[in-house]
From Swiss-Prot:
Phylogenetic placement of the source organism: Bacteria, Pseudomonadati, Pseudomonadota, Gammaproteobacteria, Aeromonadales
A Pfam cross-reference name: GTP_cyclohydro2
Protein name: GTP cyclohydrolase-2
Xref: InterPro entries: GTP_cyclohydro_II, RibA, RibA-like_sf
Cofactor list: Zn(2+)
Organism whose genome encodes this protein: Aeromonas hydrophila subsp. hydrophila (strain ATCC 7966 / DSM 30187 / BCRC 13018 / CCUG 14551 / JCM 1027 / KCTC 2358 / NCIMB 9240 / NCTC 8049)
Length: 197
């Protein structure tokens, strides 16, 4: 049984071209998630894709504390240039701890904690995201394999474990700045994210 149900589709014009916006609902929680699709993503050829976890602060409020908004824009640009691809927008804010806890974690980071220490101090694991829903979304979209835009090896392993082969990792290193340097270094050192030196 799938963890998500495809609920609705519409066109979504963006600065990079027109995507199909696909809405999904988690069967257990009712939480909604979205996919942006361009071109025909069915078939055997690997699809350029990104699994993007919701980041209100980076995606909508232009925060420089993270690289999320920069990665979101770059991923959509890359898909548009390719003419074919999918971006999953997964509602797992703050690596799964939610917006209010993310703000609490930011407060701890303001006092010197790194992103992992802040989550742990609040009683959470470093990363609480569940990638089962991502695999189920991709399967309902008939994606058979990915060229995954990510720096996170956990996303690649998760897709492989759920039967979505990752044919290629496409690095997505965007938006490094003085405000997120410590954050990105922590992701590399404690969460095994892959960044060029």
């Amino acid at each position: 049984m799938s963890s998500v149900t495809l609920v609705a589709k519409s066109k979504l014009p963006t600065p990079w071209g027109t995507f199909t916006l696909v809405g999904f609902q988690e069967t257990g929680t009712g939480k909604d998630h979205a996919a942006l699709v361009m071109g025909d993503i069915t078939g055997d050829e690997p699809v350029l894709g990104r699994i993007h976890s919701e980041c209100l602060t980076g995606d909508a409020l232009f925060s420089l504390r993270c690289d999320c908004g920069f990665q979101l824009q770059a991923a959509l640009e890359n898909i548009a240039k390719a003419g074919r691809g999918v971006l999953l927008y997964v509602r797992q804010e703050g690596r799964g701890i939610g917006l209010l806890n993310k703000i609490r974690a930011y407060h701890l980071q303001d006092q010197g904690a790194d992103t992992v220490e802040a989550n742990v101090a609040l009683g959470f694991a470093a990363d609480m995201r569940d990638y089962t829903i991502c695999a189920d979304m991709l399967k309902q979209l008939e994606v058979k394999s990915l060229k995954l835009m990510t720096n996170n090896p956990r996303k690649m392993k998760a897709m492989e474990s759920f039967g979505i082969p990752v044919a290629e990792r496409v690095p997505l290193q965007e938006g490094r700045n003085p405000h997120n340097e410590f954050y990105l270094s922590t992701k590399a050192n404690k969460l095994d994210h892959m960044f060029k030196k």
